[in-house]
């Protein structure tokens, strides 16, 4: 029997977190390739440490890419423009080690097959307007507000930061926020009192729903007391190390493959986006309150080897009907996914911070709910509603 009363916690990190810096540089490279060569193949990894960026991977393209310029522009946009912050876009070294994609992989992908084997998951639920789990959505809201406040002139803040939100569920529904943790890099001269006041008033109060925050909600700001050394000086940053932040905050399962730096022929990315698209449309159609979709592929093979739909006991029609409707309504070959979601556009750098899902920007095509009516019809829900007079 599923849990009904519990606490669930998810975390988010800012764009200035070193792992997210790596993700954004990798996706900036991908976008640069797609602008010039939509058929380019990209598998780009980034590593950052004090004073330098390393870009490595396998990239096959006709595009001409200035990697050092691209890396520095990305770091500058994030906000690391002074040695006082521990990293400087203007002076950092950029090392590049890029080869072409193996022709052994290319021969399967070029004919429409999957770029690798693996399983991917998509998830949606009716806890928030974005059909995302509440804990991760609120954690992202806090980190986005941290960055917004910093850019709006709260200059005591620095780019690196994290949030963690614990939501109390009653009868299986979000009832209140139990604990909020914010750790933010800051100027050395700022007092703890001033920092705490600023984060409470200009970040937490603006980011979280007032109806869910009460007198018992615990607010923990920089619990260690000091966070001056941050960014790549404090921690090495590597592409693909924040895969739970990127997805559902642990509420939905994850197949293990990271997203950033990968062109959409890699089903790690494109099929996970399709999984979200399917799950969100299932929930939006009213077929279930929660939905998780798993798809799995073999390298070089176009059709998925399996498709699974789990609604956790919330389905309005038998799950078998939903699964059959999914196969009927959605094309699940890599080519169909790429075409259906228009994935050969340079839109990926925006995905690399604050989550790939639950976003409202129009470029996030996998967040549309334009298939909900077709799904409801295919699964027989429309007939049930008609009989019931709904």
From Swiss-Prot:
It is found in: Cytoplasm. Keywords: ATP-binding, Cytoplasm, Magnesium, Metal-binding, Nucleotide-binding, One-carbon metabolism, Potassium, Transferase. Binds 2 divalent ions per subunit. GO terms for cellular component: cytoplasm. K(+) binds at residue 45. Catalyzes the formation of S-adenosylmethionine (AdoMet) from methionine and ATP. The overall synthetic reaction is composed of two sequential steps, AdoMet formation and the subsequent tripolyphosphate hydrolysis which occurs prior to release of AdoMet from the enzyme. This is S-adenosylmethionine synthase. The lineage of its organism: Bacteria, Pseudomonadati, Myxococcota, Myxococcia, Myxococcales. The gene is metK.
């Amino acid at each position: 029997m599923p849990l009904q009363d519990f606490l669930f916690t998810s975390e988010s990190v800012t764009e200035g977190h070193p792992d997210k810096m790596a993700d954004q540089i990798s996706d900036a490279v991908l976008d640069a390739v797609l602008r010039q060569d939509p058929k380019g193949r990209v598998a780009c990894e980034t590593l950052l440490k004090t004073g330098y960026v390393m870009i490595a991977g396998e990239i096959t393209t006709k595009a001409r890419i200035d990697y050092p310029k691209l890396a520095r522009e990305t770091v500058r946009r994030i906000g690391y423009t002074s040695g006082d912050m521990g990293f400087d876009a203007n002076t950092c070294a950029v090392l590049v080690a890029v080869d072409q994609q193996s022709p052994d992989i290319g021969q399967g992908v070029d004919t429409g097959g999957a770029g690798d084997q693996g399983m991917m998951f998509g998830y949606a639920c009716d806890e928030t307007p974005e059909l995302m789990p509440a804990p991760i959505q609120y954690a992202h809201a806090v980190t986005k507000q941290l960055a917004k406040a910093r850019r709006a002139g709260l200059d005591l803040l620095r780019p690196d930061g994290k949030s963690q939100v614990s939501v109390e569920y009653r009868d299986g529904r979000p009832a209140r926020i139990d604990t909020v943790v914010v750790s933010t890099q800051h100027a050395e001269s700022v007092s703890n009192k001033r920092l705490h006041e600023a984060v409470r008033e200009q970040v937490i109060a603006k980011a979280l729903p007032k109806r869910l925050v009460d007198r018992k909600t615990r607010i923990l700001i920089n619990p260690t007391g000091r966070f001056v050394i941050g960014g790549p000086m404090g921690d090495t940053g590597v592409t693909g190390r924040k895969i739970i932040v990127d997805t559902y905050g642990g509420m939905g399962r994850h197949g293990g493959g990271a997203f950033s730096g990968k062109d959409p022929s890699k089903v790690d990315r494109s099929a996970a986006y399709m999984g979200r698209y399917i799950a969100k449309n299932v929930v939006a159609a009213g077929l279930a309150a929660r939905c998780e979709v798993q798809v799995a592929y073999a390298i070089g093979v176009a059709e998925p080897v399996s498709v699974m739909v789990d609604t956790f006991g919330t389905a309005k029609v038998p799950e078998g009907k939903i699964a059959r409707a999914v196969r009927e309504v959605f094309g699940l070959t890599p080519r169909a996914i790429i075409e259906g979601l228009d994935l050969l556009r340079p839109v990926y750098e925006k995905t690399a911070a604050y989550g790939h899902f639950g976003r409202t920007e129009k470029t996030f095509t996998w967040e549309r709910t334009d298939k909900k009516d077709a799904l409801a019809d295919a699964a027989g829900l429309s007939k049930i509603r008609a009989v019931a007079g709904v």
